[in-house]
Amino acid sequence: MFDFDATLPLMAVQFLILTVILNALLYKPLGQALDNRDEYIRTNLQQAKERLQQATELAQQYEQELASTRRQAQALIEEARVEAQKIATAEIAEAQQAVQAELLKIQAEIDQQKQATLQALEGQVASLSEQLLAKLMA
């Protein structure tokens, strides 16, 4: 059934030589290529994580700067609104004073014209009374 002659040790030696040759020519370079590929993937993954972290930090920084800028813009808008309100209030007060002064001036002119008209009418009443009396007597 099984012969133990010189072929068995020769096959064992051939197997060992083939194993050494395959190990030297195929398995080690293939293992090294797989190790290099694994290292390349790990390196790229680590770099991607670092870039993602940097991008996240930059995004947070930009968000904070944007929020700060928005707050500053809102403060400037509020300040401008308050200033415009002050200016409008001052101009309204100035216009009211000008209108009040004009009203006083017009009232004074009306009073003066009223007095002049009353004096003229008093003078005419006296002369008309004399004319009426003269006509009635005549």
UniProtKB/Swiss-Prot annotation:
Residue list for modification N-formylmethionine: 1
Gene Ontology MF: a single term: proton-transporting ATPase activity, rotational mechanism
Cited InterPro entries: ATP_synth_b, ATP_synth_b/b'su_bac/chlpt, ATP_synthase_B_chain
Keyword tRNA-binding: no
Pfam families documented for this protein: ATP-synt_B
Location (main, coarse): membrane
Quaternary assembly: F-type ATPases have 2 components, F(1) - the catalytic core - and F(0) - the membrane proton channel. F(1) has five subunits: alpha(3), beta(3), gamma(1), delta(1), epsilon(1). F(0) has four main subunits: a(1), b(1), b'(1) and c(10-14). The alpha and beta chains form an alternating ring which encloses part of the gamma chain. F(1) is attached to F(0) by a central stalk formed by the gamma and epsilon chains, while a peripheral stalk is formed by the delta, b and b' chains.
Family: Belongs to the ATPase B chain family.
Function per UniProt: F(1)F(0) ATP synthase produces ATP from ADP in the presence of a proton or sodium gradient. F-type ATPases consist of two structural domains, F(1) containing the extramembraneous catalytic core and F(0) containing the membrane proton channel, linked together by a central stalk and a peripheral stalk. During catalysis, ATP synthesis in the catalytic domain of F(1) is coupled via a rotary mechanism of the central stalk subunits to proton translocation.
Name of the protein described by the UniProt record: ATP synthase subunit b'
Species name: Thermosynechococcus vestitus (strain NIES-2133 / IAM M-273 / BP-1)
